[in-house]
């Protein structure tokens, strides 16, 4: 198999680094790096839910995605300055939220909210997939925080791990984890969100330069799922380390009647 411009095989991910405890204030805080793409993912816990959710006994998970002005070579204005959130930002924010809600039992949260924020510090392709992969680790830490505080009705509300990766057809070849140089000229561009149980959460695919046959779709999915297995292993290794902050003390155990 011939090498790509950065020396990788077609089925090889860029170097993946997951750093927990990147900042101190949120319950979960992660810096994830896919090569030169760097995304800070935080998961903050707040008591209560939105008005439409009150009285349901269910929690909620929401997500926001944004890029810092200097994340790309050319500085872009903050969307808050423009006075509106762009369509791409809204789309990716919703994608991150949908992806993470696929793995958590919201009933176990009670009426509490987990707010996930993904901020792209440096972009070189694959920012949304890096955001989802890192956000899962931040979410897992937030769940540990809630469990320590005695806020969960189920101590293990996460049913699976979530990871995401980009795949595409570049120069007629199926490739995984596209940097900007490849993504900008891909004939087919696809993002795949998957669980560690082998199921799919979301598939976003477009024939940018040409149509493509079903056989190519199968190759893209096979390569994406293989890459996600590598990402799941990286998440597992990161989460095997102790919680990087200070966990709250839970409520004291209730006394048995007559004690």
Curated annotation (Swiss-Prot):
Say which enzyme class the record assigns.
transferase
Q: State if Translocase is listed as a keyword.
A: no
Cite a single Pfam family from the UniProt record: RNase_PH_C
Known catalytic reactions: tRNA(n+1) + phosphate = tRNA(n) + a ribonucleoside 5'-diphosphate
SUPFAM superfamilies documented for this protein: Ribonuclease PH domain 2-like, Ribosomal protein S5 domain 2-like
The protein's matches in InterPro entries, at most eight in alphabetical order, are given as: ExoRNase_PH_dom1, ExoRNase_PH_dom2, ExoRNase_PH_dom2_sf, PNPase/RNase_PH_dom_sf, Ribosomal_Su5_D2-typ_SF, RNase_PH, RNase_PH_bac-type, RNase_PH_CS
* Molecular function terms, GO-annotated: 3'-5'-RNA exonuclease activity; tRNA binding; tRNA nucleotidyltransferase activity
Name the UniProt key words of this record, in alphabetical order: Nucleotidyltransferase, RNA-binding, rRNA processing, Transferase, tRNA processing, tRNA-binding
- In short, the EC number is 2.7.7.56
Biological process (GO), any one: tRNA processing
Binding-site residues for phosphate, renumbered to this chain: 88, 126-128
Top-rank taxon, per record: Bacteria
* Subunit structure, interactors included: Homohexameric ring arranged as a trimer of dimers.
Question: Which family does the UniProt entry place this protein in?
Answer: Belongs to the RNase PH family.
HAMAP family named among the record's database cross-references: RNase_PH
Described purpose of this protein according to its UniProt entry = Phosphorolytic 3'-5' exoribonuclease that plays an important role in tRNA 3'-end maturation. Removes nucleotide residues following the 3'-CCA terminus of tRNAs; can also add nucleotides to the ends of RNA molecules by using nucleoside diphosphates as substrates, but this may not be physiologically important. Probably plays a role in initiation of 16S rRNA degradation (leading to ribosome degradation) during starvation.
PANTHER family, per the entry? EXOSOME COMPLEX COMPONENT, EXOSOME COMPLEX COMPONENT RRP41
Report what the protein is called. Ribonuclease PH
Q: Which organism is it from?
A: Mycobacterium ulcerans (strain Agy99)
Q: Which gene encodes it?
A: rph
